[in-house]
Structures are given as structure tokens and as C-alpha cells.
Swiss-Prot record:
Protein name: Fructose-1,6-bisphosphatase class 1
Keyword Metal-binding: yes
Entry binding sites for Mg(2+) 2: D114, D117, E269
Cited HAMAP family: FBPase_class1 (MF_01855)
UniProt similarity note: Belongs to the FBPase class 1 family.
Protein source organism: Sulfurihydrogenibium sp. (strain YO3AOP1)
InterPro entries xref list: FBPase_C_dom, FBPase_class-1, FBPase_N, FBPtase, Fructose_bisphosphatase_AS
PROSITE patterns associated with the record: FBPASE
């Protein structure tokens, strides 16, 4: 039985014991993620002193400016995940194509990740994070990444804020672990996380409301205001979703006239966050279909995202349908 204060490694081993045929491969894979994010956390804390803030002078596959800390985080994850030998392939927001580490040629899993979500906020000291999604290796090629979200073996994120916290699900609920820098360990601080069925916060960039293309969305937001909801929008998906998981409400990044297919990436942003939301008792949709039911067609595919508690999400689906 997991107890508050249990370290992440012990928790992972305890979960492994629930599966008599487990080989330990997933456990070792998760430990590799744990190790990499601890190092990233240390660099985030020192970023202002180490000349790793600002732009790296290049653009990623999305055409976005790469931040120096983004590039460092990406390299650290590639290093640790490759050396673990537990991943057949790695896909990143910062890579045009997946890489296939020599050490992972016999591995069981593939992983997609956003090394540093919200990196445009680095210079202003706002919470940022790492998001990851693990699938089973099936066909031993790029198509292993193009599996529906409900087939994820594990998903999670690490938020680098006032404290560093890793939020994880292996399909048996959601648990949060806070990094104790004194001992260098993630300790269970938020066991069995559940999103409230009804919250008081909506999180969306309302400055884009004239560009939204979902009929009924403006009316939906106005109806939440009429119910006394308050707006909280940070612009860092990890931070906004983290608050939504804990306090309830809704997080939304809808399609608009500029981004008709949505802005957030399915594989390493929308899908893992949807997995966590559903595991925590919430709902995640594009406005038209459940995010976890989408079969990806491209590694960097984008989708609209709405996720949150049952009350807000059921109301959203009803108003978008009738909008």
C-alpha cells in the first residue's frame, strides 16, 4: 500500500509486484525518466546563473524558436533514455524524426516527449515542465508511435515550479511525487489524485476568442462566468493542466482560424495529458472526439484540446454540439 513519503523507486517496484509476469523493463524505463528529470530540474534552478536562458539560435520541426534550456533538456532525455536500453525509439518535439538507440534494439517500449513545455516562459521564471508518453513496441518501426492514446503503458509530466513534482500514471490511477532536493528523491506527496467533478476555474487564452472556430465555445465560456468561475491562464500547458487536475475546472486550447487543427501536439502533449486526466476521473476531448481514441497519422500531429472535470466537460460537449 503506497503511503505518503514513499520514494518513487519503491513505488515503482510495488506496482511491478502487481504483475506476476513483469520483467522489470517498464520499471527501469521509468527510473531513466526520473534520473533525467532530476538533472533537468537542477539546470532549471540554475538557469539564470548559467547562461542557458534565451534562444539557441535555431528552430525546431514546428518552426518554433528553440530555447537553450529546451535543447539542453532534450539532449539530457535522449542521453538517459538511450543509455537505459529500455526504449526502442524516441520521439521528441525537438526532433524531425524519431531516433532508434543502438542500446534499445531489443527494448519493449517507445517514448514520445516534450522536453520542456512552456519554454517561452523560461526567461520570466514561470513554471515549465517535461511531458512523456510510453507505448509498447509493436511493429518495430515509426508506426509504433502512431497508436491510440488509450494504449499508453504510462504517461506523466514533471513540473518545475516552486517545487519539482512528477505526476505519473501506469493505468492504475494518478500519483504525484515531489522532489526532495536534500535527499535527491521523488517522494509520494499526492497519492491517488482525483480531479474534482466540478471546479471554479476555466483556463483558456480568451484574447483569441474572435479567432475560435468552435460554434458554441464563446457562449460556453460566458456561461461559466455567469456561474462565478474565474479565469486562470499561465500559457504553460504543464502548469495549467497541473492546476486543473488539483483544483478542477477546465483547460482548453481550441482550434482557431490560424491553427485549424489545433496547436498542441497529440503524441507528446495532448495524449499523455488526456491519459492522466481520464485516470484521475476527468474527461478529455477535441470537442468532437475523445483524445484517447484518436489514431495518430503523424508524429507531430496537432489537435484541439479540452480537458477537465465531469461537470465542465459534459456541459462543454453539450454546448459545442448545439452551438
Amino acid at each position: 500500500m503506497a503511503k505518503i513519503g514513499m520514494d518513487l523507486n519503491s513505488f515503482i517496484l510495488e506496482q511491478e509486484r502487481l504483475y506476476p509476469n513483469a520483467t522489470g523493463s517498464l520499471s527501469r524505463a521509468l527510473v531513466a525518466i526520473e534520473s533525467a528529470t532530476k538533472v533537468i530540474a537542477s539546470h532549471v534552478r540554475m538557469a539564470g546563473l548559467a547562461d542557458i536562458l534565451g534562444m539557441a539560435g535555431k528552430k525546431n520541426i514546428q518552426g518554433e524558436e528553440v530555447q537553450k534550456l529546451d535543447e539542453l533538456s532534450n539532449n539530457l532525455l535522449i542521453q538517459y533514455l538511450s543509455q537505459s536500453g529500455e526504449f526502442f525509439a524516441l520521439a521528441s518535439e525537438e526532433l524531425d524524426e524519431p531516433i532508434f538507440p543502438e542500446e534499445g534494439k531489443d527494448a519493449k517500449y517507445v517514448i514520445a516527449f516534450d522536453p520542456l513545455d512552456g519554454s517561452s516562459n523560461i526567461d520570466v521564471n514561470i513554471s515549465i515542465g517535461t511531458i512523456f508518453s510510453i507505448h509498447r513496441r509493436v511493429n518495430s518501426d515509426v508506426s509504433d508511435f502512431l497508436q491510440e492514446g488509450y494504449k499508453q503503458v504510462a504517461a506523466g509530466y514533471v513540473i518545475y515550479g516552486s517545487s519539482t513534482m512528477l505526476v505519473l500514471s501506469t493505468g492504475n490511477g494518478v500519483n504525484g511525487f515531489t522532489l526532495d532536493p536534500a535527499v535527491g528523491m521523488y517522494l509520494l506527496s499526492h497519492p491517488n489524485m482525483k480531479i474534482p467533478e466540478k471546479g471554479k476555474i476555466y483556463s483558456i487564452n480568451e484574447s483569441n476568442d474572435k479567432k475560435w472556430i468552435d460554434a458554441g465555445l464563446k457562449e460556453y465560456i460566458e456561461s461559466l462566468k455567469d456561474e462565478g468561475y474565474t479565469s486562470r491562464y499561465i500559457g504553460s500547458m504543464v502548469a495549467d493542466v497541473h492546476r486543473t487536475l488539483i483544483k478542477g475546472g477546465i483547460f482548453a486550447y481550441p482550434a482557431d482560424v490560424k491553427n485549424k487543427n489545433g496547436k498542441l501536439r497529440l503524441l507528446y502533449e495532448a495524449s499523455p495529458m488526456a491519459f492522466l486526466t481520464v485516470q484521475a476521473g476527468g474527461i478529455a476531448t477535441t470537442g468532437k472526439e475523445d483524445i484517447l481514441n484518436i489514431k495518430p497519422t503523424d508524429i507531430h500531429q496537432r489537435v484541439p484540446v479540452f480537458l477537465g472535470g465531469k461537470y465542465e466537460m459534459e456541459k462543454l460537449k453539450s454546448m459545442l454540439k448545439n452551438g
